[in-house]
Amino acid sequence: MVLVYKYFSCENEIENSIKPVINLMESSLLDKTTSNSIVLTTFNDFSNWARLSSLWPLLYGTSCCFIESASLIGSRSDSDRYGLVPRSSPRQADLVITAGTVTMKMAPSLVRLYEQMPEPKYVIAMGACTITGGMFSTDSYSTVRGVDKPIPVDVYLPGCPPKPEAIIDAIVKLRKRVAQETYESKIRLKPGNRFFTSIHQFRFVSNNLTGEYSKQSLRQFTKTELYSTLEVPFDETTDEYKGSAVSFQESMDEGDPVAIDKP
């Protein structure tokens, strides 16, 4: 209520001049409709919205790309503003950023870490070596030609190595994908229903390392051949070396190599 004093001589006029003024704050509350005060959504959308700012990445680096991904923790990139909290345990991580070359011996460990992560989980393939094998993809027998062979990949991030700004852009694209997920898509992407892009066409061969390599006939040299290979002067008549700088001491066993004693 607001008092407006027009005439101070008459009390009746003062009382009649009292006029009610509508409170604007109360009117806004009264004018609000149900659609503006209550948000109607589904549990799936609410779950996606809650997970957008809580993607916890797993620290997994095997090569130089990990140096760029580790720089996200610094103040220059400030990955905390996106809710990225690096974790060392796969059971507390939602995202794994594979940074570096994946070898044949390291692939089973990567699959084991991926299986220990709770659903839903995501993978970002960072760097050329992770996506296609990089410079090791042509003549290397121990490099996996793409991390999407053992585990599924959600976002591919090419580069050698990618900059921290590119990693943030990949995370933003992953957030958009998480926001559009549905329950049917989560069921379809379960481990039992996943289909990988391609498989390796490697074949197993027999092991030729039997330990008999040093005992083959091609590896047996006579003294003359051995000394000529070493380019040391040798007198075949006296069966001795020329010069006093180096003296050779024959071994007791014939199969043992010649011992060299330097003064």
From Swiss-Prot:
Role this protein plays: NDH shuttles electrons from NAD(P)H:plastoquinone, via FMN and iron-sulfur (Fe-S) centers, to quinones in the photosynthetic chain and possibly in a chloroplast respiratory chain. The immediate electron acceptor for the enzyme in this species is believed to be plastoquinone. Couples the redox reaction to proton translocation, and thus conserves the redox energy in a proton gradient.
Amino-acid positions noted as binding [4Fe-4S] cluster in the UniProt annotation, renumbered to this chain: 64-65, 129, 160
CC per GO annotation: chloroplast thylakoid membrane; respiratory chain complex I
Top EC category: translocase
InterPro entries found in the cross-reference section: NADH_UbQ_OxRdtase-like_20kDa, NADH_UQ_OxRdtase_20Kd_su
GO MF annotations, alphabetized: 4 iron, 4 sulfur cluster binding; iron ion binding; NADH dehydrogenase (ubiquinone) activity; quinone binding
Catalytic activity as recorded in UniProt: a plastoquinone + NADH + (n+1) H(+)(in) = a plastoquinol + NAD(+) + n H(+)(out); a plastoquinone + NADPH + (n+1) H(+)(in) = a plastoquinol + NADP(+) + n H(+)(out)
Keyword terms of this UniProt record: 4Fe-4S, Chloroplast, Iron, Iron-sulfur, Membrane, Metal-binding, NAD, NADP, Plastid, Plastoquinone, Quinone, Thylakoid, Translocase, Transport
Annotated EC: 7.1.1.-
Any coiled-coil regions, as ranges: none
Required cofactor(s): [4Fe-4S] cluster
Descriptive protein name: NAD(P)H-quinone oxidoreductase subunit K, chloroplastic
Subcellular location, record wording: Plastid, Chloroplast thylakoid membrane
Subunit structure: NDH is composed of at least 16 different subunits, 5 of which are encoded in the nucleus.
Cofactor note: Binds 1 [4Fe-4S] cluster.
BP GO annotations: aerobic respiration; electron transport coupled proton transport; photosynthesis, light reaction
Pfam families in UniProt: Oxidored_q6 (PF01058)
